[in-house]
Amino acid sequence: MEKSVLLVGGAGFIGSHIAERLVKDDYRVVVVDDLSTGKIGNIEKLNQYDNFEFEKVDIRDFEQLEKLFEKYRPQIVNHHAAQKSVPYSIDDPIMDESINIKGLLNLIVLSGKYKIESFTFASSGGALSGDIDEGEQSVENDTPQLMSPYAISKYTGEKYIKLYSELYGFKYTILRYANVYGPRQIVDGESGVIPIFMNNILEGKPSTLMAYEDMPKGCIRDYIYVSDVVEANMISVKKPLNTVVNIGTGKEISILDVYHILQEKFETDLEIKKVGPRKGDIRRSVLCINKVSELCGWKPKVDIEEGIYKLKEYYKNPYLNKRKLDINIKV
């Protein structure tokens, strides 16, 4: 059997896909999740495997976390638990800090104490994007705009990991994600526009486009399919990079154009209403992926057209458990 991985936030959208891959590749996987946003249905099929365990624990609870480190003695920590909402971080920065900074520090301290080998951290390429112009891409050493407490907490987390990796001697990889989408992404909370738009289309409801006056097609984003994100995580598990890397496609698209692709795939002409921008939103976020490609050869394989087609096919599955995915499907 491969090494032991403590996968924190492993019942969530991205984490559950990583959990499946790790189990398949014969790692000993311990998913830690408080299920505040993660769903047990995302991982329950993994219970049939001997190399899988689930523990319901809040990362802010140091004592309970330490019991897990003592019990399982993980060699690798993969951290995907977070308060992910930009608007919520503005409304309640103390809560954002308690999860994204205090919770992370609990994991870091225990990682040092129990002498883990490597630490993978899911950061945000979108929230930490530099101030880029049309046609430009944000690189890892750009000065982040830090337009929300969420962005600040993620950036702070990156700095803590780099510092304590040197103090404690573990390797690390910081993955700055573009806008990730794919199966199991929930429509409530900070889920991104694709599942929100898709759910509205399937329910026959109009969608809303938040746009700046000088950007009538909405903000510019970089969308990455979840299977490509899983591959990046597997690289970090097998060979930590000891740096921060962008995980995106490097291809920009407006939010309105994303909606038009959904209209085409789902064969609908439902309207979209325009309103003003949301507080804390970055106007343009497109990630340069040259660094990660040069370091380890990672490149995305799924473009936005194929990714949305895959989503459509996924949600047409007659065996889909709607309760697990928290989305109303009418196909």
Residue map of PLM features:
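Residue-level recognition of oxygen-bearing side chains
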Residues: 64, 85, 95, 102, ...
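Hydrophobic alpha-helix immediately C-terminal to the catalytic Tyr-X-X-X-Lys motif of short-chain
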Residues: 156, 160, 164, 193, ...
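The catalytic Tyr-centered alpha-helix of NAD(P)H-dependent dehydrogenases
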Residues: 142, 146-153, 177, 186, ...
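Short, charged helix-to-loop "capping" segments that act as catalytic/coupling loops
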Residues: 70-74, 129-136, 187-191, 205-226
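N-terminal Rossmann-like NAD(P)+-binding domain of SDR-like oxidoreductases, especially those catalyzing
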Residues: 1-180, 298, 302, 309-310, ...
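C-terminal substrate-binding subdomain of Rossmann-fold SDR/epimerase-dehydratase oxidoreductases
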Residues: 202-331
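Active-site phosphate/pyrophosphate- and oxyanion-stabilizing loops and adjacent acidic/basic residues
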Residues: 44, 66, 162, 195, ...
